[in-house]
Amino acid sequence: MASIMKRGDSYSVRYKYKDYSGKPCEGWESFKTKKEAQERKITVEKELLDGSFLVPDTMTVEELLHKWISIQSTKHKWSPKTYTQSVAMVQNLIVPYIGKRKVQELRTYDIEKFYATLARTPCGQYVHGVKQTLTDKQKKRLLSSTSIREVHTLLKTAFSYAVEWDLIHKIPLPRDAPKVNIEERTIWDEKTMLAALQTIENPALHLAVHMSMILSLREGEILGLQLSDLDFDAADGRGTISVSKTMQRANKDALEKLDPN
């Protein structure tokens, strides 16, 4: 089912297969040594016999990720925030480095090198996929381990679909996810909180900051509050605030992609 031909200083493995539509095709793969060609010949013949042969595909990592986002964002009804964050991660942290690589040619070693590159990459190196000119100070602020872990999580999910779509046999990611360095956050004490409130002159901002401190509300929860969420006539006479909704910044493109109507 497969044969080896010497072509100049290399060896080619020639075989026949059927594409996704059942159309007969011919495949050629070149190798530097005869041993490599023989090993590939054995593998191809085995895969053609047991049905595990992967139809050669030129899809790149960038094409895979855009296809995955398009399908999954609709299927799972992503929020505008999730969509925007995923697109930004693909544009700025993945495509500039491995976006042009063919999915079927990507190996675990390539991903390991990619993660190592990200660990040395400054924050904001790419914006909307365009490389930025950074100051010396900006270059010193590197991507966090959390950001690299998020890239790993996104790739793991996307490549799992590549396996389902018969593009690859297995996910080409390292067995262990990138380690996250947990940094303890600095929390304001009561003195700092009071000093901040005394500094703020804008009444609306003062109220928002006060509520975030006293009630531990997030920015989106505070901005989402309406008069109907306030009850000044509670039974205990203290009044209540009901947090029933949240507000978030949404990219116009995300809204149009998720709800074209």
Model-derived features with residue positions:
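N-terminal helical hairpins
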Residues: 29-58, 71-79, 92-93
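Short, Arg/Lys-rich segments that mark the N-terminal edge of DNA/RNA- and chromatin-recognition modules
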Residues: 1-30, 240, 245, 251-254
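Conserved tyrosine-mediated DNA breakage-rejoining catalytic core shared by Y-recombinases
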Residues: 7, 184-186, 191-192, 225-261
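Basic, Lys/Arg- and aromatic-enriched nucleic-acid-binding interface segment
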Residues: 124-129, 136-145, 149-151, 164-227, ...
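Short, basic/aromatic-rich helical patch in the C-terminal catalytic core of site-specific tyrosine
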Residues: 13, 111, 155-159, 216, ...
